[in-house]
Amino acid sequence: MNERLHYARIGTIGAEIRACRVSPVDLVDLCLSRIDALNPQLNAFITVLHDRARAAARRAADDIRSGRWRGALHGVPVAVKDFYDTAGVRTTAGFERFKARVPGKDADVVAALDRAGAILLGKTNMHQLGMGTTGLESGFGAVRNPWNDAFIPGGSSSGSAAAVAAGLCYATIDTDAIGSCRLPAACCGVVGFKASYGAISTRGILDGEPADEAILWLAHPGITTRGVADAATVFAAVANEHGTLTAATDDAASGRRIRIGIAEPPTSSGDVSAAFGAAIEKVRELGHEVVSAAAPFDVPRFGDLRTIAADRQTVAERRFKEVDVVVLPTLTTTVPRVEASANPQSLSPANTLFANYFGLPAISVPCGFTGGSGTAQAGGSPSSDGGLPIGLQLMGRRFDEATLLRIADAYERDTEWPTQPPLPIPSR
């Protein structure tokens, strides 16, 4: 019973909470117990808010019983990457020198979660200061991949992907500047979603600390969940006035066939290419028009902010003139081993960075597993000899999250790759 609840989707658990068949108090206790049991191995959380979460759960239970239901996230346990300021709770960015940094105000997205009634369990670990893609460098220790700790979890939102994959919480709010949410989602076999630039507020990411203005133009809030519909639910709760789940085109809104561009970069490894090819066959079966497409893999130097703004307008006018969604692998290789990842940028963001540069919505969904020999598995489960997840990335027009999420959800429903790792973590 407990395992079923830990891996339930937000839509399911939210309905159970609203109907008072599951209490937020019991659910939070289950999650905290699981964190206490598994976090010593995973190191997914830097800070766990036992007392605060239980108090919030009691308030949520009282409100829901009294008919004051706030929506689909009310009473749902979530976590936030330790990049976002949380009033009265330390925010470290995985940087040991920030271990006593306690903000006085919530980041906008944290405040939005609170308004939605979500229960904050704690702050997730990350590659320190967001400056790496492996998840191995943090002032609070490396995060471990819940599928196999001999392999990296990806970064910089490493703790979030590990926490969601291990059933410690139902969703996390993250950041994504070069793929920081999508890369670890692909490594850990979960969903990583980055909305369009400007659709979710970034205010309150280490507020008051020095930051590179060009990097801020690339930084997007991200959402990690176990399913596409869950990502859409969280997005609806935290998006600002620019973020919408209304389709941007008449074709997408009506449900008629849309054009999906297939863009596999030449740098993909053989294992990734095999899984990608199988995924594309599934995409064809969805009934939409599939064509070849050139994705903007070559990102210009981004020192001039005026250049970024102009390029974003160009891609909106030209790159998506012929297609509605572009599909490509999330990673260029299979998940790297820890011993091969001494460089903090060992996991290449070559397939993810351009979505940040151009401000486009993008999502990574599971599309298969490698076998212990590195062979992509076409079946519905990881191989018995240590399969690692492989991610499929979909990218859409700016501010057309609705079409992107609809296509990703249809693919997910047609494949249903497992998102429950074989805990305790195997190591080989």
Task: Please identify what each model-predicted range represents.
Residues 13-19, 97-101, 219-226, 394-395:
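Short, well-ordered beta-strand elements within core beta-sheets of diverse protein domains
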Residues 37, 165-266, 277-282, 286, ...:
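Structural helix-boundary/capping segments
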Residues 12-15, 19, 33, 125, ...:
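Serine-dependent amide/ester hydrolase catalytic core
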Residues 1-54, 284-288, 420-428:
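An N-terminal boundary/leader segment
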Residues 53-61, 117-118, 127:
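Long amphipathic alpha-helix in the N-terminal Rossmann-like dinucleotide-binding domain
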Residues 43, 170, 324-326:
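Conserved acidic residues
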Residues 73-221, 263, 330-343, 372, ...:
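Short glycine/serine-rich loop/turn segments
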